[in-house]
Amino acid sequence: MKNKNKIKIKVNGKKILLSESETIEKLVKRLKLPIKKVAIELNRKILDKNRLDKVKIKKNDKIEIVHFIGGG
């Protein structure tokens, strides 16, 4: 498998390869996380959930995703 047009990023401390045109929204869907129940930090800045489809992931980005789980 060629890594042409792929970029390395870190998600929750793990290195992964993605297409260079990937958005944050696509990444969250790929990880099978419910967009309404996550908080996402990109390079130490919290992202607006309403703009996830517009934020393109770049080489060496550091992404932290926190998934909220209900309980009591």
Could you tell me what each predicted segment is?
Residues 1-71:
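Ubiquitin-like/PB1-type beta-grasp interaction modules and other compact soluble beta-rich domains
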